[in-house]
Amino acid sequence: MRRPKISLKKYFYLTLICALLLIFGFSLKEREIWKTLSPRSSQITTQQQQHQHLHQLQSMDEEHPMATSSTPPPIAATLLPEVADNLVEEPEQTVLEEEESEADRLQEPPAEKAWFFKNGEYYPKPAKTYSNRKARKRHAPRLLPHQDPYSDRIINQLMYVPHNYEEIKSSGKLKTILLYNGLGPWNVKKGRDVFLKAKCPVDTCELTANRDLASTADMILYKDHYIPTGIRRPSNSKQVSMLYYLECPYHTQNVKVPDAINWTATYRRDSTIVAPYEKWQYYDTKVQQQEQDINYSVNKTKKVAWFVSNCGARNGRLQYAHELQKYIEVDIYGACGNFKCSRSTADKCFEILDNDYKFYLAFENSNCKDYITEKFFVNALNRRVLPIVMGARPEDYEVSAPRRSYIHVDEFSSPKELAEYLRILDHDDELYNSYFKWKGTGEFINTYYWCRVCATLHNEEQLRKPRWYTDLNDWWRGPGVCTTRSWRNFKARKDVISDSSDD
């Protein structure tokens, strides 16, 4: 029997298929052998890759340094040496070290507290310099409102030190701040005393009340009342004119002079130097609530208290309280109510508040943007009572107060609806106590006003590009800044500060 003939073409295809099968089989065998080897070889390769990556990061840092305290992070308690330095100084980690248990990580020492906290010891370092224009802009310290409009920038200012600060100190040159209304209204001494006693990170400033220095001072600072100097200032002048207001627009001066003021210092968050009545700062912004060992409602038999002496406030707070009284017990102490508690025995009054009452009316005398005073921070949050607030907008309390630490009247359509919710809280200890979980997660810090003024005055980059309030009066008391009614339907005012630069 004759064998069938196979063409050369078929031989080629058969050979190709056999070769592919052999290659596939060899690949499978090699993979099995690789798996049986010690993991040490792969670990060494991983370490080599990590070392190469670390070397690349170090090279990048040398070419483009990372930002330091010139742009501090929002968490004050974690303001530690910059990431770039950590990358250089930390020893190489093995794969086993990277797989360290979570329990071991939790045993690491806590981050060092920044200097403005109680017992805080960490002070900022001078900012780094950048030769590249884009890098300078990207890492510029966010000290002014246009650089960070969604923050009060207080922490940024507290942690700012100019890059050439050592040269400034060695030169002996000081920034002169002229208090045009005199030293008395500020209760300070001339010279550097206020900066040195506060241990400011930047203390190369001096105070004076000598108006003869009006043409040469680095800053002219007005308190509550603007007075024209009569000196014509060159257009390229780096001198700063700053106006300080403590009270709300209803009780402050009208300033109708255009382009007379380029910095402001008020309780408003869009001021150049924000000067709040109090400043709450978390130790760690990731930890804003924690369980409490205290039942804040225990043995409290009374509902709502209010200490008040001004019965004619223009926001209608007294009328609101009287309406609230129709639906829940409200004890009004002082000239506007039937209960008495003298200011001379304030401590005793607050003991009554702590021991007997569950709620406190922290009502401001005016409904103005960002206007939150000691009525809330001191009289309420420092006590063991839940504050009900009226004054600033709901969003202002959200960014200024500890999370879930109060109730805003504008969360409810009427005093009756508010009273219904207060009754729910009165009968639910767990829900009531949930409003106190913020306690222990941070503290009210000293904002060191003079330290921040001095530090910001050393930001030469921004002094070369001055900004002016074209209409300070409109910025301070324009539409949407204050209201005599509820905030629920208000319209935000336009931004009126001029911007001549192209940042």
From Swiss-Prot:
Biased composition (Low complexity) is annotated at 47-58
Q: Name one GO cellular component term.
A: Golgi medial cisterna
Q: In which pathway does it act?
A: Protein modification; protein glycosylation
Q: Which residues are glycosylated?
A: N262, N295, N299
Membrane topology, record value: Single-pass type II membrane protein
Give the E.C. number(s). Answer: 2.4.1.214
InterPro entries associated with the record: Glyco_tran_10_C (IPR055270), Glyco_tran_10_N (IPR031481), Glyco_trans_10 (IPR001503), GT10-like_C_sf (IPR038577)
Molecular functions (GO terms): alpha-(1->3)-fucosyltransferase activity; glycoprotein 3-alpha-L-fucosyltransferase activity
Q: What class of enzyme is it?
A: transferase
Cofactors needed by this protein, per the record, are: Mn(2+)
- Please give the knockout or disruption phenotype noted for this protein: Defective alpha-1,3-fucosylation activity and a significantly lower longitudinal length-to-width ratio of the ventral nerve cord (VNC).
Q: Could you tell me which residue ranges are on the Lumenal side of the membrane?
A: 29-503
Q: Does the keyword Membrane apply?
A: yes
Q: What is its main location?
A: Golgi
Write down the chemical reaction(s) this protein catalyses: N(4)-{beta-D-GlcNAc-(1->2)-alpha-D-Man-(1->3)-[beta-D-GlcNAc-(1->2)-alpha-D-Man-(1->6)]-beta-D-Man-(1->4)-beta-D-GlcNAc-(1->4)-beta-D-GlcNAc}-L-asparaginyl-[protein] + GDP-beta-L-fucose = N(4)-{beta-D-GlcNAc-(1->2)-alpha-D-Man-(1->3)-[beta-D-GlcNAc-(1->2)-alpha-D-Man-(1->6)]-beta-D-Man-(1->4)-beta-D-GlcNAc-(1->4)-[alpha-L-Fuc(1->3)]-beta-D-GlcNAc}-L-asparaginyl-[protein] + GDP + H(+)
| Protein localization | Golgi apparatus, Golgi stack membrane
| UniProt KW keywords | Glycoprotein, Glycosyltransferase, Golgi apparatus, Membrane, Signal-anchor, Transferase, Transmembrane, Transmembrane helix
Q: Give yes or no: UniProt keyword Transmembrane.
A: yes
Residues assigned to the Cytoplasmic compartment are: 1-10
The protein's role, per its UniProt record: Catalyzes alpha-1,3 glycosidic linkages of N-glycans. Plays a role in neuronal development by promoting ventral nerve cord formation, possibly by promoting interactions between migrating cells and the extracellular matrix or by promoting neural activity.
Family matches, as PANTHER family: ALPHA-(1,3)-FUCOSYLTRANSFERASE C-RELATED (PTHR48438:SF1)
Q: What is this protein called?
A: Glycoprotein 3-alpha-L-fucosyltransferase A
Annotated organism of origin: Drosophila melanogaster
Could you tell me the gene encoding this protein? FucTA
